[in-house]
Structure formats: C-alpha cells, structure tokens
Amino acid sequence: MNTKSPILILIAGASGSGKTTFANEIIARIPKNTTSVVICQDSYYISNSQLNKKERRLINYDHPSSFEWELMREQLSDIKKRKKIKVPIYDYKTEIRLDKTIDISDVDVIVLEGIYAIYDDVINQIADLKIFIETPKDECLIRRILRDVNERNRSFESVITQWRSTVSPMYDQFVEPSKKNANVSVLWNEHNRVALHLIHKWINNIH
C-alpha cells in the first residue's frame, strides 16, 4: 500500500459552471499508474426520505444547510488517510439518498466537486488545491436547463423557477463569496487547456 498522503483537490463554482467536466478532465490526464476518484458533493445531500415528494420539492437544495457536513468532513479526512469510505448515493429523480453506497479506498488523487466544495473551513484545511470555476451565469443557466430536463426528469418551467428562487440567489449569497478560499480561479466558458495543463503539471510535481 502507498503510504504517501493522497492529493485532495476541491472544485467549486456555480451550478452548471462545468465543475464535473473539469474534474473528469483532470482525472483523464492522470497517469494510469496513479489511482484517482471524483466525488460529487451532491452525494452528501441530507436524506429527506421521511418527506413526501411534494414536501421534498420545497427544500432549498442550494443552501449550505442542505448538506450533511459532518459526514462529508469525516469521509474526506478518512480517505486522506487512505481509509475505506462508503460514499452515499443521491438519486436526483426521487430526491432521496439510496440505501446502497460506493466503496472508495486507497486512492492517490481525490477530486471533490460541488457548489460548496471550498465553502467549509474544516475541509479547506485538509485540501491540497482549491479551484473555483468561473462561467458566465447565462451559460450556467443554459447548461442547467439542458441537464435537468434531459437527465433529471425536470420540466423547463420547474428549472427556471428554481433558478430564480434559490439557485441564483444562493450563488450570490454563499457560493460566489467562497471564491476567496480558492488557490486558483479558472475561466471555463470554453475548454481551458492551459489551466488543465498547469494543474496536471502541479499534480505530477507533488505526487
């Protein structure tokens, strides 16, 4: 077993900014002999299975309080020590956490991506690199509409309503201010090969 501490990279930004794509691009450039994983912060949404579907639709999923922070901190701390963790699985269509989990252990590079990836002080302290993805809001909205309608069984009207009522306001109030915690801000309205190259070079230098 590799005893060297794994690299933890945090990627934050607005909903639809391209965090998942950027995370996957980073992982794709890592050498095959280096183990890696992308963890979506949405996995740590608080399970509201006790509520009916109508009640769950009233929850503000874009507020920091919608996440189970203690579990997130514990699991990221454990995986940094190469301990095995069981990451929850969140179902976007039913809006509840599933009973099954994903087992992750002994990886060299961990990427956590989510709107609040660099929001929490405890998680920031154990991270090796904190990235904020900057994408124009109108582009984020277009991407979110396409994703939620095609992949998450949402109507166009519901996506727009949620954007206006919670997504955009919570970005302005909580997500955008967390940018001050980032080591690097990346423009991602287009494919930023320079940023990817520099981050890949950084990973190779410290690993």
UniProtKB/Swiss-Prot annotation:
Gene name for this UniProt entry: udk
Places the protein is found: Cytoplasm
Record EC number: 2.7.1.48
Catalytic reaction equation(s): uridine + ATP = UMP + ADP + H(+); cytidine + ATP = CMP + ADP + H(+)
Protein name, as recorded: Uridine kinase
The keyword Phosphoprotein is annotated on this UniProt entry: no
Residues holding ATP: G13, A14, S15, G16, S17, G18, K19, T20
InterPro entries listed in its UniProt record: P-loop_NTPase (IPR027417), PRK/URK (IPR006083), Uridine_kinase (IPR026008), Uridine_kinase-like (IPR000764)
HAMAP family: Uridine_kinase (MF_00551)
